[in-house]
Amino acid sequence: MASTVRPSFSLGNETLKVPLALFALNRQRLCERLRKNGAVQAGSAVVLQGGEEMQRYCTDTSIIFRQESFFHWAFGVIESGCYGVIDVDTGKSTLFVPRLPASYATWMGKIHSKEHFKEKYAVDDVQYADEIASVLTSRNPSVLLTLRGVNTDSGNVCREASFEGISKFTVNNTILHPEIVECRVFKTDMELEVLRYTNRISSEAHREVMKAVKVGMKEYEMESLFQHYCYSKGGMRHTSYTCICCSGENAAVLHYGHAGAPNDRTIKDGDICLFDMGGEYYCFASDITCSFPANGKFTDDQKAIYEAVLRSCRTVMSTMKPGVWWPDMHRLADRIHLEELTRIGLLSGSVDAMLQVHLGAVFMPHGLGHFLGLDVHDVGGYPEGVERIDEPGLRSLRTARHLEPGMVLTVEPGIYFIDHLLDQALADPAQACFFNQEVLQRFRNFGGVRIEEDVVVTDSGMELLTCVPRTVEEIEACMAGCDKALAPSGPK
């Protein structure tokens, strides 16, 4: 009797079971889009190449492998050195796996059969990668659709599939990229379940960090605790990006944590902490930022800046719904920040006039948020016809699209006191006239506050995926060990 067990990925214990049907549905969605494209010939085949193992420079020390995202989206394969082919007309899938030498069994473990991979990944056929040219020749596709296109966040070109003998086939490398990117923009219900999981585990890890942080600790101790929780409780071997664990003036460094500033400052009494960290499960990302006082109690100035950012974050989320233009949400956050900084007394004058001279970008030079999925800055932000807005702040926005159901984005407003941006503003008469320099001086070494939530656009609003303490009262209670269990808010 045939097995009724549906293939799934899980790392055991309490980790999420991800059905391989998720990837079968993705392949189906891609084929349906391609068949509607008038430029796609009958008999076309999609060819994707997975990631390769990499070594550290010239050594034989392997870097932990993580699958290439487009290949993972279509096949969910965790092994390196694979290819995938999808028949566009029928939707049938073929996975090509490496033919491993006998010595592999000595050093790396059991060599699995093709049937093993067919069952593991629920594909229609499995062949060896060194036979891809001969297998495709026997199938005689009219054209091979390969992946080539620019990532609008990095400016890098994705790797196009290549194998010995590909020159014998007719190849088109322009059709596939925009179609598969657009598929990735809109998440299925199964994909959303994984993103809910990555957010739940990462949110729990952030709460553990809040409870553990103490004056005198190193920033990297909090990074270590976050990673340990995500891996031990959630099976997350990877983080979605380099952990950003800022304290004090470092909280004004937007992408702190790099090799030259490796989360190595000692946390001091009176510091604000800004911790931007997200765990990754089965290549699905999360991206969460929490800001809180190192000693567990907000000062008046910390509370004022924090609640300004919280107001902008919550106003944006309550305004989000299908049809909303994302740059308008960035401008809304800017307006609220300037209103609040005026209320605090740091600025004075007309907020409309401040917006005219782009004063908001002095305090929030980055974009309000970005797509999230298999990459932390997920693809699809600027498809053909969507132009980047060349204005301070907005030019850093990673998408300028109108919101649609199924899109997953971060909402991450922030207010930062970045010396060189403040100095530039004070040297510009059009901006300097709004500053109360005596009050500004009080905030010069403040750092900054960012609040980052992950949300999915629904038919009527949005669903909040992140569940961490957010109000001043919730944060102080959590840091005192008196927090209560939180849950995502659900659709709005």
UniProtKB/Swiss-Prot annotation:
As recorded in Swiss-Prot or TrEMBL, the protein's gene is named: Pepd
Under the subunit heading, UniProt states: Homodimer.
> EC number(s)?
3.4.13.9
KW Membrane (keyword) present:
no
Sorted keywords for this record are: Acetylation, Collagen degradation, Dipeptidase, Hydrolase, Manganese, Metal-binding, Metalloprotease, Phosphoprotein, Protease
Q: Which family does it belong to?
A: Belongs to the peptidase M24B family. Eukaryotic-type prolidase subfamily.
Name the catalysed reactions.
Xaa-L-Pro dipeptide + H2O = an L-alpha-amino acid + L-proline
Record GO terms (molecular function): manganese ion binding; metalloaminopeptidase activity; peptidase activity; proline dipeptidase activity
The record describes how the cofactor is bound as:
Binds 2 manganese ions per subunit.
Modified sites of kind N-acetylalanine: A2
Main EC class the enzyme belongs to? hydrolase
Name the UniProt record assigns to this protein: Xaa-Pro dipeptidase
Q: Which cofactors?
A: Mn(2+)
In the record, Phosphoserine modifications are located at: S167
Task performed by this protein: Dipeptidase that catalyzes the hydrolysis of dipeptides with a prolyl (Xaa-Pro) or hydroxyprolyl residue in the C-terminal position. The preferred dipeptide substrate is Gly-Pro, but other Xaa-Pro dipeptides, such as Ala-Pro, Met-Pro, Phe-Pro, Val-Pro and Leu-Pro, can be cleaved. Plays an important role in collagen metabolism because the high level of iminoacids in collagen.
Q: What is the lineage of its organism?
A: Eukaryota, Metazoa, Chordata, Craniata, Vertebrata
Pfam families named among the record's database cross-references: AMP_N, Peptidase_M24
Which parts of the sequence bind a dipeptide? Answer: H255, D287, H377, R398
Gene Ontology biological process terms in this record: collagen catabolic process; negative regulation of programmed cell death; proteolysis
Q: Where does Mn(2+) 2 bind?
A: D287, H370, E412, E452
Q: Which InterPro entries match?
A: Aminopep_P_N, Creatin/AminoP/Spt16_N, Creatinase/aminopeptidase-like, Pept_M24, Peptidase_M24B_aminopep-P_CS, X-Pro_dipept-like
Residues holding Mn(2+) 1: D276, D287, E452
Output the superkingdom of the source species: Eukaryota
